[in-house]
From Swiss-Prot:
It is an enzyme of class 2 (transferase). This is Ribosomal RNA large subunit methyltransferase K/L. Gene3D superfamilies: 3.30.2130.30, RNA methyltransferase domain (HRMD) like (3.30.750.80), Vaccinia Virus protein VP39 (3.40.50.150). Keywords: Cytoplasm, Methyltransferase, RNA-binding, rRNA processing, S-adenosyl-L-methionine, Transferase. It comes from the Bacteria. GO terms for cellular component: cytoplasm. Its EC number is 2.1.1.173, 2.1.1.264.
């Protein structure tokens, strides 16, 4: 009787125990990551050939305490290695774990290798060769605290490597995990199965192998036991011959049929090739199709199971498309697959909620480092594909009301960029902005007291509802998360797409970028201020400080300004400003662009201007600025410098976004200036709920100064 250990992915131990017991294993004991069991030689080989769930089958050789590297060396050398494999065989050591003395797994593996080689040298005056690739013998050592376990890895390569999958698409499932997903799905051999996002076909192939009684190890070309001195070749040949007979008979007898599709034709060709190598190609029909074209391949029955591992995405920008995909998929399941079962495996339970289906069973498992969930659903017939109540219904109703009002208003105003929703409801803390045919959803970062998973679920509900209310394709929605920007973060790129969209604002054309930066290049709340500047600037010399992408300069130029001077510290934004000026025909020496620290430039210029627009940051500590700037603390210093540049009948428009900003009117008067607040005049209909989004002032020389 052999004492053996079968390892597996965390979360699959109970399934593996049941599988081993069905094969005839005794005394099965679950530990984290595997199952200890007993069995004779026949059972040992059967577990290697037939286990669909095990990652490896190990034969323990020794267990001992390790308090030093010498203890490790002596414990390994105590094993009679020449009785296990011949000196003419190659070997490799896989070492995992550390303790206070063995702090590096590579060092531990080196000590084990030395002990094995020295064991041969002492007894035979010869040494075996170490081979990193496909060794004849693989020694597994696991160190936990002060206990080391040494085992012979009978598998060689991991058992998930069945031998049929030479090529895969992106993010493939390991075969043993795929087998577990199928077993947990409720699918029964003899019934049909569909995978509409099948990738390289692993789920379908594993299920077809189960249905046709094909041993998962039948196609492997390399094992870890064939160079073992105790290898029973006759018994192994008997078992593999029996497995081949069963596979041929099973292929003829099974009534199961399998259907797979994927949008990627190249991946579908991989899936077909994998199925041929696995010997189950005749059971599986593969098609290259977009999931939106999915139909039930057996509309007249019998009913079966839809099993899939849909994409979950790691980048924020991909989430709107994935949310739309899951929402559409849920509707299709109800429309075309009534009476079937559905089982989905995903790293994102939030995306699964977008199906708008109620799961009747749920399992957890690891897919490599990812925590994943598998949810099973019983699909009820619904030929219209209608779901339940729209998710985030309060939000959807408010957005629908706002859209009806604001779309009409925007058309009358001659603008195509405006805010549709601005955290109107406390539970849905987002801003929704329309930019022509596209929509940007900005999530305000939730407080740390809010459960991150709950916040993420609520955001997904918002996106789902936004797509539905606006009847918007998912590729027209851009998702961003807005949080307090510190230092240079406000200038750093979020993406590298470089996609610009030309939009209209009154008589101006402006370039926006919805993906690459936190802001889009157009501050919507300053729209009326820009319009006012255009009217104020006819025949005037116009200065735009902290100019960002120069949109105010565009309006001034279109309003007939004699000259525009646009100053900003960022080369990126100045190049953007130049694009904005050029697309409006504002070229020539009278339209200057200056890259400089605005505060330093102010201190060093003596130029005169009729209209000055300044919209400084609330606070700045950029490395390229010599000092910090605080708009509340420093606005008088700023006004003193601006006064020098302002012609006697000129006007400064001063705006900032600091909530609770207090203009020092006495200090302004002491400078010989007058300030008049015009905030209410610069606030538009789409920002009616947020009266504190900015404050705005007109500053002129006092009557005495004039």
């Amino acid at each position: 009787m052999n004492s053996l250990f079968a390892s597996t992915a965390r979360g699959l131990e109970e399934l593996l125990k049941s599988e081993l017991e069905a094969l005839g294993a005794h005394d099965c004991k679950i530990v984290q990551g595997g199952v200890h069991f007993q069995g004779d030689d026949r059972l040992m080989y059967q577990s290697l050939l037939w286990s669909r769930l095990a990652s490896r089958i190990l034969l323990p050789l020794n267990e001992f305490k390790v308090y030093s590297d010498l203890d490790l060396y002596l414990g390994v050398q105590a094993i009679d290695w020449p009785s296990i494999f011949g000196v003419d065989k190659t070997f490799a050591v896989h070492f995992s774990g550390v303790n206070d003395e063995i702090r590096n797994s590579q060092y531990g593996a080196l000590k084990v290798k030395d002990a094995i080689v020295d064991s041969f040298t002492r007894k035979m005056d010869q040494r075996p060769t170490v081979a990193k690739q496909q060794p004849d013998i693989r020694v597994n050592v696991f160190l936990q605290r002060d206990m080391a376990s040494v085992a012979l890895d009978l598998s060689g390569e991991g058992l998930h490597q069945r031998g049929y999958r030479d090529l895969t698409g992106q993010a493939p499932l390991k075969e043993n995990l795929a087998a577990a997903i199928i077993q947990r799905s409720g699918w029964q051999p003899g019934t049909p199965m569909v995978d509409p996002m099948c990738g390289s076909g692993t789920l379908l192939i594993e299920a077809a192998m189960m249905a046709s009684d094909r041993a998962p190890g039948l196609h492997r070309g390399h094992w870890g036991f064939t160079a073992w001195n105790a290898f029973n070749e006759a018994l192994w040949r008997e078992l593999t011959t029996e497995a081949q007979v069963r596979a041929r008979r099973g292929l003829l007898e099974t009534s199961s049929r399998f259907f797979g599709s994927d949008i990627d034709r190249r991946v579908i060709e991989m899936a077909r090739a994998n199925a041929r190598r696995a010997g189950v190609a005749e059971l599986i029909t593969f098609n290259a199709n977009d999931i939106s074209k999915l139909v039930n391949p057996l509309p007249e029955g019998p009913v079966g199971t839809v099993i899939s591992n849909p994409p979950y995405g790691e980048r924020l920008e991909s989430e709107p498309a994935l949310i739309a995909l899951h929402n559409m998929f849920g509707r299709m399941m109800k429309t075309a697959f009534g009476g079937w079962r559905l089982s989905l495996f995903s790293a994102s339970p939030e995306l699964l909620s977008c199906l708008q289906l109620r799961a009747d069973r749920e399992f957890k498992a690891k897919n490599g480092p990812l925590d994943c969930v598998q949810k099973n659903y019983q699909l009820t017939a619904n030929p219209l594909g209608a779901g339940g109540a729209l998710v985030a219904e309060d939000y959807a109703n408010r957005l629908r009301k706002n859209v009806k009002k604001l779309d009409k208003w925007a058309k009358q105003q001659g603008i195509e960029c405006y805010r549709l929703y601005d955290a109107d409801l406390p539970d849905y803390n987002v801003a929704v902005d329309r930019y022509g045919s596209k929509v940007v959803v900005q999530e305000y970062a939730p407080p740390k007291t809010i459960d991150p998973q709950k916040a993420r679920q609520r955001l997904f509900d918002v996106i789902n509802a936004t797509l539905a209310v606006l009847e918007l394709p998912s590729n027209q929605l851009v998702l961003k998360t807005r949080e307090r920007q510190k230092g240079k973060n406000q200038y750093e790129k979020l993406a590298q797409k470089g996609e610009f969209l030309l939009v209209s604002e009154y008589n101006a054309k402006l370039w926006v970028n919805l993906t690459d930066y936190l802001d889009t290049g157009l501050f919507l709340d300053h729209r009326i201020a820009r319009q006012m500047l255009g009217k104020m600037s006819q025949g005037k010399d116009f200065l735009n400080l902290f100019a960002y992408t120069g949109t105010a300069s565009v309006h001034a130029g279109l309003g007939g300004a004699r000259s525009t001077t646009t100053v900003d510290m960022s080369r990126t934004y100045l190049e953007w400003a130049e694009k904005n000026l050029r697309v409006n025909g504002l070229t020539g020496q009278q339209h200057r662009l200056i890259q400089a620290d605005c505060l330093s430039w102010l201190s060093n210029t003596d130029e005169q201007f009729d209209v000055i627009f300044i919209d400084p940051p609330t606070f700045s500590n950029s490395k390229r600025m010599e000092t910090t700037f605080d708009v509340q603390r420093d606005h008088l210093v700023l006004m003193k410098e601006l006064k020098r540049l302002l012609r006697r009948k000129g006007t400064i428009m001063f705006s900032n976004n600091k909530r609770g900003f207090q203009m020092d009117l006495a200090g302004i008067a002491a400078l010989g200036l007058e300030a008049k607040e015009i905030t209410a005049l610069t606030q538009s209909e789409d920002f009616a709920r947020n009266r504190q989004i900015h404050n705005c002032w007109l500053v002129t020389h006092s009557q005495e100064e004039k």
